[in-house]
Amino acid sequence: MHLIRAAGAVCLAVVLIAGCRFNEDQHQAEGENTAVTQLKSVPYSNFSLRVSYGDGEHNRYEGIYTKNGTQEKAEIQDKLSGVNQEGEEALDEMKMILSELSVTDQMAETEVIHSVLAAFNLDSHYDHIDLKLKLKDGSIREIKK
């Protein structure tokens, strides 16, 4: 009789553990499938970055993000790496970067440039930079060098 109870207890434990494990795997998979566009909040309504490293089209990086109401668009043209992204792919990339970037009205121009280049993993030895961003409070930062 004790043998039957022990076997029953073991079976019950196995079923409970397997069920909990299945539920855990399902929640993890749901988290992995959630798009970045749904997870991150971007503190800018418009963001435009153009950085040139010498002459020619092949030495330029351009990233654009715009938000009108609930409509968001982004585009990335990375001529340095030969990568062009549009649509959801570019939007995910830009939102991931911009949600981590913190630029304020009070920051010095050099600090803003340093923060932006670091966020986009770009070299600080640029020839020209054109940055324009609009914060959610409506203030605009524009830097051209």
Curated annotation (Swiss-Prot):
InterPro entries, A to Z: YusW
Keyword Coiled coil part of the UniProt annotation: yes
Superkingdom of the organism of origin: Bacteria
Region forming the signal peptide: 1-29
One Pfam family per UniProt: YusW
Coiled coil residues, start to end: 67-101
UniProt keywords, alphabetically: Coiled coil, Signal
Name this polypeptide is given: Uncharacterized protein YusW
Organism: Bacillus subtilis (strain 168)
Lineage, broadest ranks: Bacteria, Bacillati, Bacillota, Bacilli, Bacillales
